[in-house]
Amino acid sequence: MTWIACELHTHTFHSDGKQSLTELASGAKALGFDCIALTDHNTMTGLAHKEQVERETGLSIMSGMEWTTFFGHMVTIGINDYQDWRKVGPEDIHAGLARVHEQGGLAGMAHPFRPGSPMCTGCYWEFEIGDWNEIDYIEVWSTTFAPVKKNNIRAYRLWTDQLNKGFRLAATSGRDWHSQEPAGEPVSVTYLRINEGEAPLTDRAVEALSSGRVSVTLGPRLDLEVNIDGDVYRIGDVVSGPDKTGRLAAVQVMADFTVRHEHWHLPEQRFTISLQSNLGVLSEMAALPAQLPLHAEIPVQGLLWMRAELWGVIQGVRTLIAFTNAIYFA
């Protein structure tokens, strides 16, 4: 398997963006991305020349659309056909989710706590979710310098709350990218760990997101591995099999500080790596990049999930810099 750098929330002038698909793809390639999802508001017309743009830029483009309603915005990825969003009301979002899943697509909550009307029509999520198993992911980091923004902190907490309830859903970032104007702030990246193979990269990216093989960062890519009695589990995996009560997990946290290194800057510092779970903080360790990977032994009993977080200072602010998606425990 290999990691690819992705941007999962973008717009062109086919909705409210100020860029063509070619400009968007060229800009993404220049920033070190391997793949984007085009998610224009309520239209897929911007994808008409997708294959040509992919050939010209060398960037892979996932098909998608942002359902933009009065009751919330929902990003759909991996769909091939337009789905009419207009009949979905606040109490029947599951009808829309079913249509997306019938196409083999994924559905994610976009910026669920961004201020809504009249500032941004429908940006605040108000749909009633009856079954969280039908939500594939939450966009917990939205726009640039995402982790310092209150609405994103709430979205991250929402994701954690659902993990604590036993649901298994991914967490992503999304720039909500509308133009090629310089960001001026740190840009986050969603890394997807895709299978090797002959299938189109975009199909493998959708599968990776569906499986929760996701790591999100403002800079270095964080990875997590658990070894229990010789069985190795990675991000998105489910620890199952014989009863592991009373056993210890050998946990390894890795960080690659070379990825896209020309596109981000962190001052020299000791970073804090935190292992989080439904039981709270399992372990915290301070380390310089040269001291990685770090290792810990963690009791398995009572665990539903585990993720790694990297904390440090960026642009003078101490904040969450990177996080992995979860490893789950059956």
Task: Label each PLM-derived region with a short phrase.
Residues M1-C120, W125-F127, N133, V140-W159, ...:
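A metal-dependent hydrolase metal-coordination microenvironment
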Residues G105, D136, S188-T190:
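Generic beta-strand structural signal
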Residues L169-A170, F271:
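Residue-level recognition of the N-termini of beta-strands and the immediately preceding loop/turn
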Residues M1-W3, W177-A330:
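C-terminal functional module detector
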